[in-house]
A protein has these predicted regions:
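Symmetry-related core transmembrane helices of the 12-TM Major Facilitator Superfamily/SLC fold
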Residues: 92-95, 183-190
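C-terminal ends and interior cores of transmembrane alpha-helices
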Residues: 88, 92-109
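Transmembrane alpha-helical cores of Major Facilitator Superfamily
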Residues: 29, 60-65, 92, 150-158
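Hydrophobic core of transmembrane alpha-helices in multi-pass small-molecule transporters
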Residues: 29, 97, 109-128
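Glycine-rich segments within core transmembrane alpha-helices of 12-TM secondary carriers
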Residues: 67-70, 146-172
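Helix-loop boundary and gating motifs at the non-cytosolic
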Residues: 6-67
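Transmembrane alpha-helix termini and helix-breaking/packing motifs in multi-pass membrane transporters
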Residues: 75, 102, 161-183
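Cytoplasmic helix-loop-helix junction between adjacent transmembrane helices
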Residues: 121-154
Length: 190
């Protein structure tokens, strides 16, 4: 066994410092996506669906509630299962909620179901955020954390491009091609 390997649960693992370069960017990219979907893309979505600015503000302000309650949600992450379990569960719930959002766009009561879908995304995003922070604090050694600060920030900013610029551009192009708003957004969220 070389000097660059450690034994974790009886399994030789390469030096953790090098493996951080693989999981930190993807983890922080996925950390920023729900924020962008909730706090930016939803505004454009509701605007294009014809809601007034007052209704959009009132509706989307409720999506902040799970983030305010993060300390309470953090108790679930610590108390039950592993952090990786919560990360994977939250990502699956977010993906299923986006599919539900895509299906709700074509319904008559689309507004109610879109709010429910966005709220489920908000709760899952808050749990996801807590689990990522706790996992990072546990896995990244204290001396190495300053090295990864820039990597985390760049990955988080890339999530804004991936989560807002690309989908909204795609939805706009689909609106022009189809000449209708609802099918464009339904296609986007699926």
């Amino acid at each position: 066994m070389s000097d660059e390997q450690q034994i974790k649960n009886g399994i030789p693992i390469a030096n953790q410092w090098y493996s951080h370069w693989l999981w930190i960017p993807t983890l922080y990219l996925t950390r920023g996506l729900p924020y962008v979907i909730l706090l930016m893309t939803s505004l454009v979505f509701y605007n294009r669906m014809g809601l007034s600015n007052g209704a959009i503000t009132l509706t989307t302000s409720w999506f902040f509630l799970p983030f305010i309650l993060r300390p309470l949600l953090g108790r679930f992450v610590v108390g039950y299962k592993s952090k990786r379990f919560w990360i994977i569960l939250a990502e699956c719930v977010i993906a299923l909620s986006l599919v539900g959002l895509a299906l709700s766009v074509r319904l008559m009561d689309w507004f109610l179901w879109s709010v429910v879908s966005f709220m489920v995304i908000a709760i899952a995003a808050a749990l996801h955020d807590v689990a990522i922070e706790r996992l990072y604090n546990r896995e990244a050694l204290l001396l190495e954390r300053p090295i990864f600060f820039g990597l985390r920030a760049v990955s988080y900013l890339l999530s804004i491009i991936v989560g807002m610029a690309i989908p909204i551009t795609l939805a706009g192009n689909l609106e022009v091609i189809n000449r209708t708003v609802r099918p464009a957004w339904a296609t986007l969220f699926c």
